Amino acid sequence: MSDVEKASLPPAIFIMGPTASGKTALAMALREYLPVELISVDSALIYKGMDIGTAKPNAEELALAPHRLIDILDPAESYSAADFCRDALREMAEITAAGRIPLLVGGTMLYFKALLEGLSPLPPADAAVRQRIEEQAKEVGWEAMHRQLSEIDPVAAIRIHPNDPQRLSRALEVFFVSGNTLTELTKTSGDALPYQVHQFAIAPATRELLHQRIEQRFHQMLAADFEREARLLFARQDLHTDMPSIRCVGYRQMWSYLSGEIDYDEMVYRGICATRQLAKRQMTWLRGWDDVCWLDSEKPTEALDKVIEVVSA
């Protein structure tokens, strides 16, 4: 698409960044200066009852700056990048029709990429095929299923960990249903996003600063009674660590603690380490991102001014 064609499209803003980088604060501040409506791009914030461990904006913040696509699912439900694209496009169209600018804020980079580039049409879920895969996994184990995927689709097998049964079974299911591998089907993207997108990434200037912010926020979550929140979920007995909700950083480690597998101090240590690993993956995505304007989270006023300047140009 040419620059002239892009300029004729309605505007949208992406604010991306690693966890604990100040994305939400920047997005909320922008509401005072630009006619924006916020859409959350976060695979953890979609879940109801998972507030403290996800650093979800609190009730007061949401009253001041409502976020769409927050609290839309029960933790027992799953949500795909395709689901996100469908919902986000609907919300963006509604915001644009009202004469305002959709501002998408979050750290789930796969969602941003899927929305920006479009998704290849994959075969719909097939319950019977999925059941056969899960039954086979019970017999031989997920390690063996991963070896099977390595023979069918070695590229996908490199990306998918043997301890990720949801993604592993989906990759196998796609092949058994369509006869094509997940890698083959995702080589071609779908329709590009019909918006002029202004893309920003916010992060501290150094890794050390980001690590400090992550550790500080994890301890703040614990002080806000994250353990009690996790215990309420644990007590339901219909949730487990194979589910995307409980695989979220912090919750997975809290689950191990509540199960008696590790003690409290080990849970805290692992939770902080897992959050740092998440931030590292997010930064890896962003360093390879095209057309992104970097902002320093330690200089919030300058970051705010830069976004306003770029969007208003």
Curated annotation (Swiss-Prot):
Species classification: Bacteria, Pseudomonadati, Pseudomonadota, Gammaproteobacteria, Enterobacterales
Cofactor annotation: Mg(2+)
SUPFAM superfamilies in the cross-refs: P-loop containing nucleoside triphosphate hydrolases
GO terms (BP aspect): tRNA modification
Reaction equation(s) it catalyzes: adenosine(37) in tRNA + dimethylallyl diphosphate = N(6)-dimethylallyladenosine(37) in tRNA + diphosphate
EC number: 2.5.1.75
Gene behind the chain: miaA
Keywords per UniProt: ATP-binding, Magnesium, Nucleotide-binding, Transferase, tRNA processing
Binding-site residues, substrate: T19, A20, S21, G22, K23, T24
Described purpose of this protein according to its UniProt entry: Catalyzes the transfer of a dimethylallyl group onto the adenine at position 37 in tRNAs that read codons beginning with uridine, leading to the formation of N6-(dimethylallyl)adenosine (i(6)A).
Subunit relationships: Monomer.
Keyword Magnesium: yes
Pfam families registered for this protein in UniProt: IPPT (PF01715)
Protein family membership: Belongs to the IPP transferase family.
Residues that coordinate or bind ATP: G17, P18, T19, A20, S21, G22, K23, T24
Annotated site residue numbers, Interaction with substrate tRNA: T108, R130
GO molecular function: ATP binding; tRNA dimethylallyltransferase activity
Keyword tRNA processing: yes
Originating species: Pectobacterium carotovorum subsp. carotovorum (strain PC1)
Span of the signal peptide: none
UniProt name for this protein: tRNA dimethylallyltransferase
Renumbered residue ranges of the record's region Interaction with substrate tRNA: 42-45, 166-170, 247-252
